[in-house]
Amino acid sequence: GTKALYFAPKASYAASADAVAEFAEMVDALHENGIECLMEFCFAPGTPSGFVLQVLHHWQLRYQIDGFHLVGDASLAEEASKDALLRKTKLIFLGFDGARIYQGKRPWFRNLGEHNQGYQYHIRRFLKGDEGSLSDFTYYLRRSPETHGVINYLADHDGFTLYDSVSYEQKHNLDNGEDNMDGSNENLTWNCGAEGVTRKPAVRALRLRQLKNAVLMLMTSQGTPLIYGGDEFGNSQKGNNNAWCQDNK
């Protein structure tokens, strides 16, 4: 893969020639309006923990970033949670042992968060009526560890949008140019009786009801709900569950 430039804002995202100043102004504007700014980083396996912390320190000190979602090695959670500079910065990882990190004690400030992939898996199973899914559904609905927060979601940038999860049972990634070989084959979705776009009133009504059921479960679960941008108005990627390369809305 391409080596990332971890210390610089992406210039192509900026409207001006000065991406650094523009990014800083954006963060300031968010803070002035009571909105926190969290960034997501993906570090390759084996990346030295010292380098990872150096990157986080840079963005926290230079731009006053409020938190980070670190994709990849969750073993960094323990070291990052003990870092003096990051002790009040939100740190989100995919899976870690909070009980071991805090030795069974409740931390004075819960800055660790779990990107709760298990929630998506089991709530989607329950939503589409899979047999034997009730016990896992009730567990994840009420799960709230004392040591860290949980971020619950039913869709994110990896996989189907929420609307597509009730509209497609198969991925449709041919536009990506990889012969539909990319993207996950296990999506835990139900198309409500027709694959993709349909004019059938009964199918469309059922999809809307399933969307409402999904949002209700997400908003009433213990933890912090995460809504993928666009899901609030039923955005569709036309069944593409790996749309990172698509220049569209």
Question: Model-flagged regions — what are they?
Answer:
Residues 228-233, 237-239:
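Short acidic/histidine-rich active-site segments
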Residues 42, 46-48, 166, 172, ...:
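Short, function-defining helix-loop hinge/capping sites that tune catalysis or transport
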Residues 21-106, 114:
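Active-site neighborhood of glycoside hydrolase catalytic domains
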Residues 77-229:
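Conserved alpha/beta catalytic core and glycan-binding cleft of carbohydrate-active enzymes
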Residues 7-8, 14, 154-155, 161-163, ...:
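Generic, ordered loop/turn and secondary-structure boundary motif
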Residues 237-249:
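Extended hydrophobic/aromatic segments used for targeting, binding, or gating
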